[in-house]
Amino acid sequence: MVFKAHHRSITRQDIELEDLENAPASIASIENDTLEANVGSTPLTAKQKRNIYFLILLYLIQGVPMGLVRGSIPYFLKPNVSYSDLATYSLAAYPYSLKVLWSPIVDTYYCRSFGRRKTWVVPCMLLISSTLLLFSYNVDTWISKGSSYINSFTTWSFLLVFVCATQDIAVDGWSLNMLNPEQLSYASTAQTVGLNTGFFLSFTILLVFTSPEFANTFIRSIPSNEGLITLSGYIKFWAYFTFIASVLVCFWDESNHQEIANISDMWKTIRAALSLKNMRQLLIVHTLGKVGFVANETLTLLKATEFGLSNEMLSLIILINFPLGLALGVYTGRISNYRPLDIWLKGYWGRVVSILLNTILVYMVSNWKHRFPVFFPIFLCYTLNASFSTIQFVALGVFHSKISDPHIGGTYMTILNTLSNLGGSWPQYVMLRMADLLTVSSCSTAPHLTCSADAQKKECQALGGTCLYKRDGYYLTSIVGIFLAISICVSLITPVVRRLTKAPISSWHIHSKIAETYT
């Protein structure tokens, strides 16, 4: 049966007498409770290692569908859609940015005999499995129709991301109970390895093995028009794999069971958490921290493919970067125990440099593509961008794990991750639409063709014409992004990061209001 705890949650207006009596001790403990304290490294037990591998598996299950939605599907769609269609498709990622709305339900309602987290993880995995299986029978048709089916793609992807986001709430909360407080940085490492591996499989590996050119060049002796695998077959495989993994989760021991507040109190807890001064300042970092990057990072590789970079070469670039990303993620997780936001800030400035290099690269390739070597400059720019993105992602994950209140672990981590995901979702739609609206192009022999999609460009070439760009929205949005990234960081983000780095960990917890009120 479903169990719902009825303990009272603590807010600024609702403080228990026994808490006030213990407040002086709490105040004294805060003195050494700071993010600058390096917790050191404690050896992992065999059970904790198993838990880390288990977390990697759960995050892998999330990473595979997210790699499809955020990685390979836009590339399969690109020949038949415009930037505006891609902007519409980007809305599918919004459940990750809105999951805080239903996180209290995930944290509050569960089957006590089955397990607080397994109650949600197992059904979510089964839904992911069934959704992938159904989609595998329609994906080829939707891709071939392009813009005509963009709404179907977006709707399916939205539902899939919604289920993944719900699972993420439960897994984030579960990770806080699997490891000791001084080892929580491993949770961020597990998340990085799992999500990156899933994304890598659904992006790089998928693009390579669905490519007929790759198979004909390196593997087959007799050429064929099909790759080694099909997109529908790949999706079907992961549907079955996820189902099998869900059976494993059913038998996994879930310890450290905690009874929690009812859903009404959980909503009050969210409101109390969002009312924290630190949280309001962190909101600035999250909502504005990716404004300058999303459009450039999304469009640069797509522009490179327009100028002759094949999907095979793109996959090779990402393939080479994959082990680097994993190693860098593990290393960043270790060094981020001490002042993780400082590490994040260094990654921010690195990304500013990388998007500037991206813009210069695209300009050079577009003007001298017959004399300019495409692969190595793109490889360098992608490596820089991916490395700094990984540094930011892992450092922020460590920071979230350190400041999260274990009493409401799933909900608190969801609040933090929601703020982070929202910062990457809302500017993407705006900037992609801007890039499309600012682009003015036409075909030299058929002015009615706008060359907004690859299919129109091929049609223009078939008519004996070339695409003429009076204005390319890519450069304008990139320049605007660079300006926003620098100005926002200097005026807002850097001062906030300096303040948050010095804040005690207890000041992030709801119960810290007890000591604050007592004093």
Curated annotation (Swiss-Prot):
GO terms for molecular function: acetyl-CoA transmembrane transporter activity. The keyword Membrane applies. It comes from the Eukaryota. Keywords: Membrane, Transmembrane, Transmembrane helix, Transport. Its main location: membrane. The keyword Membrane applies. GO terms for biological process: acetyl-CoA transmembrane transport. GO terms for cellular component: cytoplasm; Golgi apparatus; membrane. It is found in: Membrane. It is a multi-pass membrane protein. This is Uncharacterized protein C21B10.09. It comes from Schizosaccharomyces pombe (strain 972 / ATCC 24843). The lineage of its organism: Eukaryota, Fungi, Dikarya, Ascomycota, Taphrinomycotina.
